[in-house]
Amino acid sequence: MALPQSKLVCTVEQYLEFERQSEERHQFIDGEIFEMAGESLAHSRIGTNFIRELSTTLRGKPCEVLSPSMKIRSGPHIKGMRNTKGLFSYADCLVVCGQPLFHDDHKDVLLNPTVVVEVLSHSTQSFDRGDKFRRYQTWNESLEDYVISWQTRPRIEHFQRRPDGKWLMEFVEGLESTLRLESIDCELRLSDLYDRVEFPEDLPEEEAQFPIGSPPSY
């Protein structure tokens, strides 16, 4: 997801009231509201491809894909008007299995995602791999798969929660490869996930130092 361009300080309830009336999307991080920046064509295509492929695969199954307009809460549910703690974020694609649980009766803030997909951008990589993922790990116990998709090459960082609660990370790269999501019994071909995506001949400097098969820095 795109990172903030501006910020305000407020409570959770103030944020939700503001966000539900706003034409733009914003994330909430411990009392600060961050406006979401725009996304590239490649970013949009990858996110749309994930939604299409997962929706087709999960048709008739107990799991469903929710739109990128659904927020995710990662933090304590503290009643009262002064609560400023927690993360309210958006994903490029998300899956929930079983009965969705929500923050309130508006049913626009999900508590129990099973799969979260983020399309990596230069401005978001530290947040998506760092603080955002740590909060998901801590507060969203339902989360089984966290998927980070690069947009400059056919490469995916897949984090899977193991039965002991620890996370296993694997790289899936190359258009001939397949991403396996055990939690929803699903296999996705990277050639489908990167359909219509054009990759740059020259990688950004911070990515060029990581050739295929090597891990990025965290």
Locate the predicted segments by residue:
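Gly/Pro/Ser/Thr-rich low-complexity, intrinsically disordered segments predominantly at protein N-termini
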Residues: M1-Y218
